[in-house]
Amino acid sequence: VTLKNVSANTVPEMKFPDAPHSLKMACGENPKRVYSSRAPSTRMGNVAGYRNARIGAENYKEQLESDPSHRDIRNETLAGVLDGEILVHNHCYRADEMATMINIGEEFGYKISTFHHGVEAYKIADLLADEGICAALWADWWGFKHEAYDMTIANIAIVDQAREGTG
């Protein structure tokens, strides 16, 4: 849900009219840390988890066709992503992880709307431009953890120039 930063008593009062729903997902160190006791604590383990979750959502969509009364909250949101009803925002720092998430989106038929943080977005600026993916980037904050080391102060300019075709 997209919210307006306004004084209100309830979240529905803050909702931006007619804005699409969105889902923010993380890649990299955060899911490795959070899910380490439930899955392999590696980037490959993360990708396996992403793919398994999307396969589960595809199966859920098939079940809904035969039994519309069947509800599975765990898969409902990702089914909305696969149907294009929910926009995807991805929290990624590294270029290889952004490229991997783009590949997963292509595999399952959805598009990533925005990459957040993206300290290595400059490395794949042309790919982001070609795919029409927005990048919400920090101007001057990096190096606070290992996956956020390899940035340049020109990150935003490089990504913007690729988008404009002037890079």
Positions of the model-derived regions?
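Polyanionic/metal-chelating signatures
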Residues: 1-114
